Amino acid sequence: MMKLVLFSIIVILFSLIGSIHGADVPGNYPLDSSGNKYPCTVLGDNQSCIDVCKKHGVKYGYCYSFKCWCEFLEDKNVSI
């Protein structure tokens, strides 16, 4: 019984550590030709933001703080 409790505690700790470190995905706000961030109105998954991110060379993006955010968008690809 004691081994089961210890095993459960270890599993919980490792899952907490994984969720803390796994949540920070690098990315950037893409900019249009005028240097402005792309606005969006529907927070979270947003097809218009996904389309914008694809124009900038990455596969996925979403609406965050009413601006499109592209995951894994490098600084060199921010502007079109």
From Swiss-Prot:
Statement: the UniProt record of this protein carries the keyword Secreted: yes
Classification via InterPro entries: LCN-type_CS_alpha_beta_dom, Scorpion_toxin-like_sf, Scorpion_toxinL/defensin
Major localization listed first in the record, in broad terms: secreted
Signal peptide: 1-22
Location(s), subcellular: Secreted
Pfam families from the UniProt entry: Toxin_3 (PF00537)
Superkingdom as given in the UniProt entry: Eukaryota
Protein name: Toxin Acra1
